[in-house]
Amino acid sequence: MNNDQSEQCVRTFLDSFYTGDVARMEQCCDDAFVSLTYAPVEIFPHFGLKQGKAWIAQAIQIQQERYSDRRHSIDFVVADDTQAAALVQATMTKRSDSRVVTLNTGEFFSLRDGRIVEHRSLFDSFDLVQQLLGDDLTNEFAARLKNAMRQ
């Protein structure tokens, strides 16, 4: 059975991120907050392991600098007293060229006393790179990978 308080905390966290409300997002988080986004940090240096609430303001600022419009829909949330998970679809418009990118993410949370202690996020970074570049790299990448697997 879903824990309504935990679910609301997760929804507030996600809504606050995409609306840029740092203070509201921080209220959802424990002082020991940690976030880990599984993505290549060489390409996305603002992802990876981040510790502390200071990351929240930085992440929102980076997103707002890069994207003129950020929208999201929460497709699914399941939560109990100590854990929660959500599926989110984000649609963002790049400032540099007005290209619209769509990102599907899996968001996972650990909670303590009704606040988020740990946040983990997964998404298809290869797909995002292709969208950001506006170029389908699948065939080129597949050919290179096929050759590498033969060696």
Regions found by a protein language model. Name each.
Residues 11-20, 43-47, 63-66, 87, ...:
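Short, mixed-charge, low-aromatic patches
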